[in-house]
């Protein structure tokens, strides 16, 4: 393996050309991480640096990260005229925004933006600067002009008095979504993931051990592949939350489904959340004493998310998940088939707990008479995306 090689983790940019334009903001120091994240998803990168960018990060470092020659000035082959699938300007300084707004084309970077815009390719601008500069009315006018021209702007919330450049994973996810938007089969998808809990008293809960990882990966992959994804997020372990609807309890999950439907019916519901089957009948108004020696908790069936969705959205597709322990693979598949009939699911992702722990396949996708073995998380995500795309075609 070459020193500059990367481990491929996805194919959402496979065969896609991304022209990375690096301008002279301090966030140019993030170019190495950003370029390598693009490559991990299969992108073929062309890269152009402005003179000001070279004062912050060297072309040598950028060339190592991108695995290609860095364009740093005018040349006879004019690589900026080779139209890519998307131009990514990161960082996009205020000076750069001003040039694009005014049509200035005084270097190869601005020519790359102009050529791609003229060819109807998406332009993604990632400005980063101090809050005072960002909030200046002139900057806001420039950003509004960019959007009016049809360009896309990605910013982060204010932190430490600055609009810092978003994490490479966030930028690449948006890049993938723009490049793949409008693909045949693109659908509006609601993904539920994470655990749920229900209170016994004000400080104690009944919950489950779901980390939310699988649903997060599915939602992430669907968004990268150009689907319009809405997420409902329960409790998760680690940084696994998209910006979406927060849902702590089974009732919250049910309410979230109704909220989503009010904004427009999804084409597909992906139910990867671990929703409690049972919840306490009554919650104690006060903390139960730790000295109690004869504590009993009565349980009742919790609201069933899948039944609610089938009732309020009868014509849409549902992909549900089923996790089992201590049974054989054949028994798992039998239960998955029964689950599809009982719940009206169009497909079921069936898992054994030992598969989640690395012992055996990651899961099985059961739909109709078809059973697909999913050996890895990547295959699981790709399998779900392929099925959704086939429904939307």
Segments and roles (model prediction):
Residues 1-393:
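A cross-family phosphate/adenosyl-ligand binding-site feature
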């Amino acid at each position: 393996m070459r020193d500059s090689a990367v481990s491929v983790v996805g194919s959402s940019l496979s065969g896609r050309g991304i022209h990375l334009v690096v301008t002279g903001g301090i966030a140019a120091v993030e170019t190495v991480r950003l370029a390598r994240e693009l490559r991990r998803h299969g992108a073929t990168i062309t890269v152009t640096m402005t003179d000001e960018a070279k004062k912050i990060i060297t072309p040598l470092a950028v060339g190592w990260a991108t695995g290609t020659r860095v364009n740093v000035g005018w040349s006879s082959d004019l690589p900026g005229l080779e139209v890519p699938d998307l131009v990514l300007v990161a960082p996009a300084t205020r000076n750069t925004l001003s040039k694009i707004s005014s049509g200035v084309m005084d270097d190869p970077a601005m020519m790359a933006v102009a050529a791609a815009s003229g060819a109807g390719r998406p332009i993604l601008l990632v400005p980063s600067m101090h809050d005072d500069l960002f909030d200046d009315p002139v900057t806001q006018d420039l950003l509004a002009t960019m959007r009016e021209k049809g360009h896309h702007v990605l910013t982060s919330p204010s932190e430490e008095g600055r609009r810092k450049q978003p994490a490479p994973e966030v930028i690449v996810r948006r890049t993938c979504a723009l490049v793949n938007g409008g693909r045949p089969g693109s659908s509006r998808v609601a993904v539920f993931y994470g655990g749920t809990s229900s209170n016994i008293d004000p400080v104690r809960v009944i919950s489950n051990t779901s980390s939310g990882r699988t649903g997060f990966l599915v939602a992430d992959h669907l968004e990268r592949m150009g689907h319009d994804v809405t997420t409902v997020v329960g409790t998760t372990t680690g940084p696994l939350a998209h910006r979406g609807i927060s849902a702590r309890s089974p009732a919250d999950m049910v309410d979230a489904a109704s909220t989503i439907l009010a904004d427009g019916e999804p084409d597909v519901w992906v139910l990867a959340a671990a929703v409690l089957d049972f919840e306490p009948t009554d919650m104690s108004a006060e903390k139960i004493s730790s000295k109690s020696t004869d504590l009993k908790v009565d349980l009742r069936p919790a609201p069933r998310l899948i039944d609610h969705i089938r009732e309020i959205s009868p014509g849409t597709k549902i992909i549900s998940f089923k996790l089992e322990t201590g049974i054989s693979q054949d028994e798992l598949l039998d239960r998955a088939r029964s689950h599809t009939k009982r719940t009206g699911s169009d497909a079921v992702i069936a898992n054994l707990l030992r598969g989640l722990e690395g012992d055996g396949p990651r899961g099985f996708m059961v739909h109709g008479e078809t059973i697909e073995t999913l050996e890895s998380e990547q295959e699981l995500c790709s399998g779900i995306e392929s099925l959704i795309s086939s429904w939307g075609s």
